[in-house]
Amino acid sequence: MSKRIWQLFASAITVALLSAVYPAFAASEPEQLVTKAEETFKNFQNDPQMSWLRSHLNAAKAVMIAPEVRKAGFVVGGSGGRAVLLARDKETGNWSGPAFYTIANASLGFQAGIEKSEVVMLIMTEKGLNSLLNDQLKLGADASIAAGPVGTGAEKGITTDVVSFSRSKGIYGGVNLDGTLVTINDGWNARFYAKAVTPVDILVRHSVTNYNAQKLQDQIAQAVIK
């Protein structure tokens, strides 16, 4: 076999090995979370029991989506998950983000038999949104929270900073988020935007963007105008 053929053969083997270790276009963990958030938001938006969420989305300052909040094992001795936050610009009405967060609680209140839930939170006040721009927020203390009404005849008199909705295996309201710590995930924000950024940079200054967020932004924007 000629030297040239050997070189081509060696190059092909190298490419094959590198492809196995570093798959082309493999999504990062933050990108995967955004994709899961798209599916979670779609699930809630299409659920006939989520009429309150749909009708009040246009009044929300921001939306937090946690595709998977687990009962145990995420943190030692506790429960939690990861979430994305998208906010609406007060002047243009455009949605920006996401910023990435970690949700954790030593004793998240899961209903019996539930191991994990998907969660959507509507941030209804400026206080609620500003609290999320800080390093850490304790739901129920730094911002008031209530479980969102479920069903077509859902009540309308909710005035808390945050309204949460959760679903698990067809069960609604499967997790109580009161007392939960919501912390900025600086590492995932840096990975998604390829530089160190804060939620203020992402959601207020709009100084960074990532095309992988466009679909989720569009989903929420379209849901608001329906």
Regions found by a protein language model. Give the residues of each.
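Bacterial N-terminal signal peptides that target proteins for export
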Residues: 1-11
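Bacterial N-terminal signal peptides
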Residues: 10-20
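Sec/Tat signal peptide C-region and signal peptidase I cleavage site
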Residues: 20-26
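Absolute protein N-terminus
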Residues: 1, 26-27
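Small-residue-enriched, tightly packed secondary-structure blocks
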Residues: 27-226
